[in-house]
Structure formats: C-alpha cells, structure tokens
Design a protein with these regions (language model features):
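Tryptophan-anchored aromatic micro-motifs
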Residues: 26-52, 100
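Short, hydrophobic/aromatic-rich segments at coil-to-beta transitions
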Residues: 38-43, 68-76, 96-97, 160-164
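Short, solvent-exposed loop/hinge segments that bridge or flank secondary-structure elements
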Residues: 43-70
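Short beta-strand segments that buttress and anchor functional surface loops
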Residues: 73-80, 100-101, 142, 165-168
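An exposed acidic His-Trp-rich patch
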Residues: 87-139
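Edge beta-strand at a domain terminus
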Residues: 113-118, 160-187
Length: 187
C-alpha cells in the first residue's frame, strides 16, 4: 500500500512539474508555409476592380518562390515582361517584415526600393499584415508619393489552395492578387 501511495504521489508531483506544450507561433507556421513553396512558380490574377490596376489585370502575373532560407524568403513577381519586382519576407526579433525590392533588368535599384513594413501583431498562420514602416514613409514623402504613407500590405498562404498579395489604404485603395497553388507553372 505504501508503495502505491508513493507511486501515486510521485506521478502527481511529476505531472505538476510538466510544462504545457507551447502553442506554435503563427508567424513560424506562416514562414514555413512560404518555404514549402520554394522553387515553384504560380500564375495569379487581380481579383479587385480598382481602375489603377488595369495594367496588372491585363498582364500575365507570375510569382516564383525562390531564395528560401529559414528566416527569409524572396519571391520575384513578374507583371507581363516586367520582372523588376521582388517581395522579401524576413523574420525579425519582433515578428515578420515585408519589403519590396525593385530593380531594373541590369539589377540596379530603381524607383522606390525596399519599402514595406513590419507586422504589428502575431497574425495567423494563413495571413500576415504589414503596416508601412517609418523608413518607407520617409522614402515615399521624399519621392512625392504621400498617398503611400498609409499603406498596409498583406500576404496570405492557404496551403494547397491559394497565395494572395494585398495592398490597402484607408482612402479606399485596394489591390488583391490571388495565385493558384494547385497549378504550378513552368515559366
């Protein structure tokens, strides 16, 4: 009987000392889902109707998940023959960061470059939002693009279904491009 009591007491003590498993960080899951797409290209389409996006809507849109590392994923985004755009999602000490890397065909920086923002909260495993950061605001103001100083970008990854890129402004500006993850493309 004494052995049974000691065994039960020991089991209770060990259970009390056990830690509850830590819930997975949605940003870690999100970045892992991006990395799972590495090496693949997907065709997309504009699903919003803003007249400012007519060129995008009438062009072939292809993203290529490339340049993959545990803490950073680079995603070139081609609009027709224009291959100047690349999205870069990076893990930071405080969360995730989205930057827009714009270069000309020779690889030289052109126009606005490395603008974007950092997540303000944990987001979800499917969606992360990136309000414009102060560095980007300064770049937009210096370049006369004050309208962009309120940008909020979002990226979504729905495994086996869809990837989405969004740009929103409080003024009502809204661009959303959705990519079909069920059909990788060769080029």
């Amino acid at each position: 009987m004494r052995t049974l009591i000691l065994t039960a007491a020991s089991a209770l003590l060990m259970a009390a000392c056990a830690t509850t498993p830590k819930a997975a960080n949605p940003q870690d899951i999100f970045l892992a889902r991006l990395n799972a797409l590495c090496g693949q290209r997907f065709e997309g389409r504009v699903v919003t109707t803003d007249a400012a996006d007519a060129d995008f809507a009438s062009s072939r849109l292809v993203m290529h998940v490339r340049d993959c590392a545990p803490d950073e994923v680079g995603i070139p985004f081609a609009v027709g023959e224009d291959r100047s755009r690349r999205w870069v999602v990076t893990r930071t000490d405080a969360g995730l960061r989205l930057k827009h890397d714009h270069r000309d065909p020779a690889g030289e920086i052109h126009g606005y470059h490395m603008y974007g923002g950092d997540t303000a909260g944990p987001g979800t495993a499917e969606r992360q939002e990136f309000p414009v950061d102060s560095e980007s605001i300064a770049q937009f103001v210096a370049g006369g693009a004050e309208v962009s100083t309120t940008n909020v970008w979002a990226v979504e990854v729905h495994p086996g279904r869809m990837f989405a890129y969004e740009l929103r402004r409080p003024s009502g500006r809204f661009l959303r491009v959705e990519f079909d993850l069920t059909r990788p493309v060769a080029e």
